[in-house]
Amino acid sequence: FYWQDFMGDLEYVRQAVRLARKYGPDDVKLFINDYNLESFWDDNKKLKSLIHWIGEWEADGVTHIDGIGTQMHLSCSMDDGTLQNRKKHIEQMFRLMAASGKLVRVSEFDMGMDDASGNAVATADMTEEMHQRMANYYEWIVSTYLKTVPPEQQWGICQWCMTDSPVGSGWRANTPVGVWTGDFYRKHAYAGYVRGLGGKVQTGIETVGQDATRAPKGIYTLGGQKLDRLPAHGVVIVDGKKIVM
């Protein structure tokens, strides 16, 4: 059943807020958390409706909702037009959320890949071009959040999938939704994430896809950790070249 069917469209949220304020910590932050707020197919209609309803719920002068959480379960696309349209509405989502005056949180963030025809791409079928495109999309989304939402309204980004989803998973099975592989190796997506945050990826190669001759001197693991000395065995990057010990 739906609570609003019994308590009404206004009271079911107001009651939840009252109880949370009464029994929760004094500094509790209350968010309305929902998915498809970046909806490109209806010009962010769901988010616009949600912001309207927050105003209705708060119209009693007592109810206060601190923030809006957006569940960004996205897919990158190999079609340029499709990807640009998705970007347009993600940026519009962040602008609308910021304009609401509420705290803004990316509460569930992961990303699959669609081919140019709109079909989901399995993890094993990802190409180098797809990996790099996805990394760039991660970078763009994270940096757009940081640029569009004022710092005082930023309430963070929560990554939903740490690793790629295995075959048979109940969530986006057999798709490249993680920033690490199933074996916990950093992906191109990890580098894009870090770049979006304004950081530098600490690897033996300066950026994704760059030639190793431009790599800094040193010894690195394949995961990008710098070592003081050569290990007794394994595969490492030495001055930009892979070495088997």
Region roles according to the model:
Residues 23-36, 50-84, 91-119:
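Aromatic- and acid-rich polysaccharide-binding/catalytic face
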Residues 71, 160, 239:
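Conserved residues at the C-terminal ends of beta-strands
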Residues 76-78, 165, 229-235:
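Short amphipathic alpha-helical segments with coiled-coil-like heptad repeat character
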